[in-house]
Amino acid sequence: MASGKEIKTQISSIGNTQKITSAMEMVAASKMKKAQERMEASRPYADTIRKVIGHVARGNLEYRHPFMEERQVKRVGYIIVSTDRGLCGGLNGNEFKKVVKHANEWKEQDVEADFAAIGSKGTSFFKRFGKLKAQVSGMGDKPELKEITGSIQVMLDAFEEGKIDRLYVVFNKFVNTMTQEPTIHQLLPLPQAGSEEDVQTGSWDYLYEPNPESILDTLIRRFVEMQVYQGVVDNFASEQAARMIAMKAATDNAEDIIDQLQLRYNKARQAAITQEISEIVSGAEAV
């Protein structure tokens, strides 16, 4: 049985760790709130671009953009959004499992896959597959669109050149503090028109300069970039929520361990006192 001094040292060590996990929990909660605000702020922009794409496409039915063309799928591409740091529970692991399962389903149809990774965890994981075409990491707490456009462009070029026939973005969708869902969203090919709701929102009659085709090309590229960026912001909010929960669990577990160690310390102290009393009594009887 450990001595009282050793147990006291353990209690002190775990107490220090508990202070760290508690601080990390509070920091994650603060970052999550800010990430939610960025997430909500970016959505209207992407939604508006989607509606404009639908209207421009419907106004030029004779032109079909290559990014809207369905074709036989021989190879697929994934842009995988992950975290740069750990200590966020099974957030990355669950996402990677979903990607691997999805890619294996395509492989059963003789369709291979290429990957682009956003985040160091995704980079290190998918490097093992040997098909990592682009990667970016180290974006910090305020990811910006310009930091990910290079990796996105690599996959857009691959689609345009016919090297891949379908493109997905994968991220952890922030549902609420307790729930983050690994999500696979198809980026390309895009549907030609918007939703029925968009169709019924009124008639748009615009003149396009220089021409609808170049505007549509720019809009679609920007839309894809915004969809991926939305995934990055969603994933960051999910990361902070998962880390907050993980750190809270660690803090609670540390409290439980401290309670158990305190009980052991009290028992050890009681045993030592009893031993001392026994020795005093034995000594008195000997006299």
Swiss-Prot record:
One of its GO terms (biological process) is proton motive force-driven plasma membrane ATP synthesis. Its main location: membrane. One of its GO terms (molecular function) is ATP binding. Keywords: ATP synthesis, Cell inner membrane, Cell membrane, CF(1), Hydrogen ion transport, Ion transport, Membrane, Transport. It is found in: Cell inner membrane. The keyword Ion transport applies. Pfam families: ATP-synt. It is a peripheral membrane protein. One of its GO terms (cellular component) is proton-transporting ATP synthase complex. F-type ATPases have 2 components, CF(1) - the catalytic core - and CF(0) - the membrane proton channel. CF(1) has five subunits: alpha(3), beta(3), gamma(1), delta(1), epsilon(1). CF(0) has three main subunits: a, b and c. Produces ATP from ADP in the presence of a proton gradient across the membrane. The gamma chain is believed to be important in regulating ATPase activity and the flow of protons through the CF(0) complex. Belongs to the ATPase gamma chain family. HAMAP family: ATP_synth_gamma_bact (MF_00815). This is ATP synthase gamma chain. It comes from Idiomarina loihiensis (strain ATCC BAA-735 / DSM 15497 / L2-TR).
